[in-house]
Swiss-Prot record:
Origin species: Burkholderia cepacia
Record has Chaperone as a keyword: no
Record-given protein name: ATP synthase subunit beta
Assembly notes: F-type ATPases have 2 components, CF(1) - the catalytic core - and CF(0) - the membrane proton channel. CF(1) has five subunits: alpha(3), beta(3), gamma(1), delta(1), epsilon(1). CF(0) has three main subunits: a(1), b(2) and c(9-12). The alpha and beta chains form an alternating ring which encloses part of the gamma chain. CF(1) is attached to CF(0) by a central stalk formed by the gamma and epsilon chains, while a peripheral stalk is formed by the delta and b chains.
Membrane topology qualifier: Peripheral membrane protein
UniProt-annotated binding residues for ATP: 153-160
Subcellular location field: Cell inner membrane
InterPro entries reported in the protein's UniProt record: AAA+_ATPase, ATP-synt_VA_C, ATP_synth_F1_bsu, ATPase_a/bsu_AS, ATPase_alpha/beta_chains, ATPase_F1/V1/A1_a/bsu_N, ATPase_F1/V1/A1_a/bsu_N_sf, ATPase_F1/V1/A1_a/bsu_nucl-bd
One CC-aspect GO term: plasma membrane
Reactions that this protein is recorded to catalyse: ATP + H2O + 4 H(+)(in) = ADP + phosphate + 5 H(+)(out)
Length: 463
């Protein structure tokens, strides 16, 4: 480090996670410069220049014990994290420091967490499908390789379990590198995930970045750390998977420090820069002509309200949205994906083929008809329906149950072994139901099975 890099300043104000530091007027730190507290490893990141040599910073760690007058040194560069193969199989914090007690990360390359998004002419569109082995996703809202997917759901409907199953199915089949960013989620889940990856021997292909629930908001703002690692693999010409759980905590952390940074709150108390912050992040999660980033992001929906500014801002950036519904979860159907609310840009006969497209639309029409008839059934009962409507309702209830599926990651809790269903089998199964080839089977036969053949087997046992 040059001597110019070690300009010293003094803390003049501490309010929660926001710290004001005064420097000599002629050597004020730049926005996003990293400052280090003298005698400790605590890092502050410059957010605003207030003038007269004073900068406002966010503390990336606990601010316990800080007081006015402490010395802070300016590193004169943004926060940089290790990237490349040495990060694989390791757990890192927001600053790229290892937290798995397995020694330092010996990486030759570091990269600033603040990067520009790729230029428009570098982007690469993708129409190649990514099979997940989860029936409802492959049928209703298929993923594109190099696309962005959001898992939307309220508290306790299964976002993390769905995310884990996707990681289990895709990361193991994929064979490439993955980056997992745990942003403000439960430490227990992070620990479970680490051991699961270890047990299935894919840990050496995954880089883990954790900023958990108990950490100050500055840490959760840094979903950028994981993204920077994923971008590096992409720029090396690799196809990488990027998982984020949970993108809402990133927004929430911004909300927590926004008022302390002196900004006026906007709708529902969110930061006024919500759309810009989300845009900056999402535009970087993209595929270029060098390599692809396929990202799956869990998005918490406050009070199950999809029109809340945070999930609503995220919607526009995604290629596929998987909406988890409390009503479906209350029926005991897992994964609790709402087939009428979930969408994908891949649902196009030119992309997924005519057969897949028509089966998807027929399944949705049948379910929509059942939804419309539900009120009539509740008041007058099934007997008042026409024979066609009775048939539609019977098929819809079978479809609804056939959309459920036992998960590998939930095997410990449910006792039933997980099922991976290939796309061809999924299409064949739903085609048989909508064509009326399963009208003679009881609806219980379709609950928690994999392929349609298993439903026939189950029906024999029931009868």
């Amino acid at each position: 480090m040059s001597t110019a890099a070690l300009v010293e300043g003094k803390i003049v104000q501490c309010i929660g996670a926001v710290i004001d530091v005064e420097f000599p007027r002629d050597s004020m730190p730049k926005i996003y410069d990293a400052l280090i507290l003298d005698g400790s490893e605590l890092t502050l990141e410059v957010q605003q220049q207030l003038g007269d040599g004073v900068v406002r910073t966010i503390c990336l760690g606990a601010s316990d014990g800080l007081r006015r007058g402490l010395t802070v040194k300016n590193t004169s560069k943004p926060i940089s994290v290790p990237v490349g193969k040495p990060t694989l199989g390791r757990i890192m914090d927001v600053l790229g420091r290892p937290i798995d007690e397995a020694g330092p990360i010996e990486s030759e390359h570091t990269r600033s967490i603040h990067q520009k998004a790729p230029a428009f002419d570098e982007l690469s569109p993708s129409t190649e499908l990514l099979e997940t082995g989860i029936k409802v996703i492959d049928l209703i809202c298929p993923f594109a390789k190099g696309g962005k997917v959001g898992l939307f759901g309220g508290a306790g409907v299964g976002k993390t379990v769905n995310m884990m199953e996707l990681i289990n199915n895709i990361a193991k089949e994929h064979g490439g590198y993955s980056v997992f960013a745990g942003v403000g989620e439960r430490t227990r889940e992070g620990n479970d995930f680490y051991h699961e990856m270890k047990d299935s021997n894919v840990l050496d292909k995954v880089a883990l970045v954790y900023g958990q629930m108990n950490e100050p908001p500055g840490n959760r703002l840094r979903v950028l750390t994981g993204l920077t690692m994923a971008e590096h693999f992409r720029d090396e010409g690799l196809d990488v998977l990027f998982f984020v759980d949970n993108i809402y905590r990133f927004t929430l952390a911004g909300t927590e420090v926004s008022a302390l940074l002196g900004r006026m709150p906007s709708a529902v108390g969110y930061q006024p820069t919500l759309a810009e912050e989300m845009g900056k992040l999402q535009e970087r999660i993209t595929s270029t002509k060098k390599g692809s980033i396929t990202s799956v992001q869990a998005v918490y929906v406050p009070a199950d309200d999809l029109t809340d500014p945070s999930p609503a801002t995220t919607f526009g950036h995604l290629d596929a949205t998987v909406v988890l519904s409390r009503d479906i979860a209350s029926l005991g159907i897992y994964p609790a994906v709402d087939p009428l609310d979930s969408t994908s840009r891949q649902i196009d006969p030119n992309v997924i083929g005519e057969e897949h497209y028509s089966i998807t639309r027929r399944v949705q029409q049948t379910l929509q008809r059942y939804k419309e008839l539900r009120d009539i059934i509740a008041i007058l009962g099934m007997d008042e329906l026409s024979p066609e409507d009775k048939l539609s309702v019977a098929r819809a209830r079978k479809i609804q149950r056939f959309l459920s599926q036992p998960f590998h990651v939930a095997e410990v809790f449910t006792g039933s072994p997980g099922k991976y269903v290939p796309l061809k089998e999924t299409i064949r199964g739903f085609k048989m139901i909508v064509d009326g080839e399963c009208d003679h089977l009881p609806e219980q036969a379709f609950y928690m099975v994999g392929t349609i053949d298993e439903a026939f087997e189950k029906a024999k046992k029931i009868s």
